[in-house]
Amino acid sequence: FGFFDENLPACEDYDFWLRFCAFEDVHFVNENLLIKNGGHDQQLSKKHWGMDRFRVTALEKLLKDQGLSEFKRKETIKELIFKLQVLIDGGRKRKKDAFVKKLDKKKTMLEVILSNERNGKV
């Protein structure tokens, strides 16, 4: 799985856990095992706008992995579409038209891929 991707300015833990969970069995423990301490000034989400940009990068990177099962590939595409929509909504709110157009094009392409696969047009 490698280590944290140091090329990502943020969400490198998200990227790592995506890769780990894609290829290893992970189980749910219904018990609090840590105390989350968020919202402080040093938090990267305070430093970078649109944190989902880095999550989109991580999901796109995962899609390039040839070892991803068909089911997990489709689920990754669905999550990528969801994250793109979050960014599109934020971009519209902030009037980032070029950003929105680029992401909307990518989202539409992924929706077509999923639709074609559902309809057997691969």
Regions found by a protein language model. Give the residues of each.
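Conserved nucleotide-sugar donor-binding catalytic segment
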Residues: 1-58
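Non-catalytic, C-terminal membrane-associated alpha-helical segments of glycosyltransferases
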Residues: 49-54, 74-122
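Amphipathic alpha-helices of TPR/Sel1-like and other helical repeat/solenoid scaffolds
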Residues: 56-63, 87
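Short, solvent-exposed, charged loop/turn and helix-capping segments
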Residues: 65-72
